[in-house]
Structure formats: C-alpha cells, structure tokens
Regions:
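N-terminal amphipathic/basic-hydrophobic helices that include classical n-h-c signal peptides
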Residues: 1-16
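The conserved acidic donor/metal-binding loop of glycosyltransferases
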Residues: 112-116
Length: 336
C-alpha cells in the first residue's frame, strides 16, 4: 500500500512513477519562441522529453537550440506539417498528438513552446502526480496561468484570457489534443483528423495543482510578434486570408496601453534569464491611449470586455464564473 501512491505494479515488481514531457514546435527561433527555456523548465522532473519538430524554414535554428540543452532525456521526432489535411489550427493538435503518442510515462506533461514553469513549482507538481497516480478517476492536472504582455514586467488577466488549463494528462491513448492544441479531450473513436468535432468527445476530469504556467506568448519584439500572428493566422485560415487580413497592417504589433495591464512583482523562472536579457524593445511600448494602426486587434481593450473584467475581478475575486471550461474539476481525497 505504501508504494501505491508513488508507483505502479507489474506482477511482483514495483515500478517507479514516470513523467514524460512533450511539446511540438516549428520555426521557434525564427518566431522568437523560448523553446529551450520551456523544455529546460520541466526537464528536472521528467524521465524523458519528446519533441515533435516540424519542417522548419532553412533560416530557422530550432533543432540546434534544442540540441544545445545537451540532455539524453530529449527525443526529437521529425515531422512534416500539412495545413490542407489539418486546417483551422488542427495541425497544432495533430503535432501535439504525435509527441504525446510517443511518451512512455504514467503522466504526460505538455508545455507549449512559449510556456515555462518556475522551478519553485516543480516539487509541488511532482508530489501531486505521485499522490494522484492511483486515483484513476483523475484524467489530468489543471494549472493556473500568468499571461505576460508586452514585456516581462506586465501580465494580462482580462476576461479574454483563460485562467486555467490542462497541462498534465494520463498516458491514455483515448486522450487527445483538442481544437488548436490549447487543451485535451477524450475521444474514444478518433479518426485521426477531426480535432474540432465535438460529438462523441468527453471533457476530462481534472484535479487542480497549486502551480502556474508562465505564458510568454505575447512577449516579443513587435516585429516578431507580428510575424508570429501571421504564422498563426496562416495555420488557422490559410495563407491567402492571412495576406488579405494583414495587407493594411504595419510590420510591428501594437501592444496597446500597458498601463491597463497588471504589474508583475514576482520572479521569473531561472531558465528564462538569458531570454529576458535580450529585451530591447522598451521604446516600442506605450502607456497611453494614443494607439497605433493595429490597436483594433486588442480584444481586452474593448468596452465590453473591460466591463466583464471589472465585474470578475471586483465581485468574483478574479474568477470567471461564466467563461467556457473545457474540463470537469474534481477534488479526490488523498492521503497526507
């Protein structure tokens, strides 16, 4: 019984719990993704880390960046993206599934290329995995989020941002990435393509873990941010629509009025030190409402969302009681 919380049994052998880390990426260095920091941040508690590496552009150095970590835990799977077969962002989910299916651990820890875990949370995460290992009713773990915005000193907690998301799931072949790889669902009879087809899918039962994912998706030099937005637009809607929608926009993204975001007073993950040292676009940020050509793209600055955000933060303690949740939260009783 003692080992039940820390291991699985096969016959008379006791096998220690294993955690597999996994991610998918393409053109990380070209689009300013902190892929190395993302992997390194969870590597200490992972027994292996699987990367589905897409067919990057010739001027991209993602492979070299991952190899520079120098860990024999890392396993790279070379892939080719097919946006015709997997449109509307589902190639992201498909690539995530490729990496997940190659995992061998009891738990699969998913970090996207712009998501980093602070080292202070690693013991908490590992302990939570250990104590829930034999609670088979738990499909995964639900993490809290900090969405950094514009620079490393501000974060966005507006209604438009999700407060929690699934980032650890059991190594169950019926659990798949969902939609554009933001989350996961159980799909028992999966055709390998229909990542946006809801009928027949099941929300996962997840237990909260007292840990944050630090999301740096909107912390880039403005020109890189615009390039990333174009890449994501292409993945979701095709190159033609991307070119049409961005025709009248500038080459630099406008982060809007940063005085309307929250000031971050904590510390960043140690693995982000090098990436943060490259910060050189302070003169491109603003703290007023003068605006730029791309200001209309900022959903969190619309009157509707500002009102909803005010209500959530002042009457619900920051919770989003009416927001859509792609999971069912459960609270299993665990032995202390």
């Amino acid at each position: 019984l003692y080992f039940a919380a820390f291991s699985t049994r096969k016959g008379t052998k006791t096998i220690p719990m294993r955690i597999s880390g996994f991610t998918m990426i393409k053109n990380a260095t070209k689009l300013y993704y902190p892929i190395r920091a993302a992997i390194e941040s969870v590597l200490p508690i992972c027994d292996e880390f699987v990367v589905a590496l897409g067919d990057c552009d010739p001027d991209d150095k993602t492979y070299e960046e991952i190899q520079s970590i120098g860990s024999d835990k890392i396993r790279i799977i070379d892939t080719v993206w097919n946006l015709e077969k997997f449109p509307r962002g589902t190639e992201n989910a498909h690539q995530t599934d490729i990496a997940k299916q190659a995992c061998t651990g009891d738990w699969c820890f998913y970090v996207q290329a712009d998501e980093v875990v602070h080292e202070k949370f690693l013991p908490v995460i590992k302990k939570r995995c250990e104590e829930l290992l034999e609670h088979k009713e738990v499909d995964g773990l639900l993490f809290k989020y900090l969405h950094f915005w514009g620079d490393y000193n501000h974060y966005n907690d507006a209604h438009t941002w999700y407060t929690d998301e699934i980032r650890i799931v059991r190594n169950d072949p019926t659990i798949h990435s969902w939609w554009s790889a933001q989350s996961f669902r159980r799909i028992r009879e999966f055709d390998g393509v229909s990542y946006r087809h809801k009928p027949g899918t099941e929300k996962l039962r997840v237990a909260p873990v007292d840990a944050y994912i630090y999301h740096y998706g909107f912390v880039r030099p403005p020109q890189y941010m615009q390039s990333k937005r174009k890449a994501l637009h292409t993945i979701h809607w095709g190159k033609g629509k991307m070119e049409s929608d961005f025709r009248d926009q500038t080459n630099e993204f406008d982060y809007g009025n940063l005085s309307k975001t929250k000031v971050f007073k904590g510390t960043h993950p140690a693995v982000m030190k090098d990436f943060i040292s490259r910060f050189n676009w302070a003169d491109k940020l603003r703290f007023d409402d003068k605006g730029g050509k791309n200001k209309s793209n900022l959903k969190h600055e619309t009157l509707k969302n500002r009102i909803i955000t005010f209500i959530e933060q002042n009457f619900f303690g920051g919770r989003q009681p009416f927001a859509y949740k792609n999971y069912k939260v459960i609270h299993p009783k665990v032995r202390k």
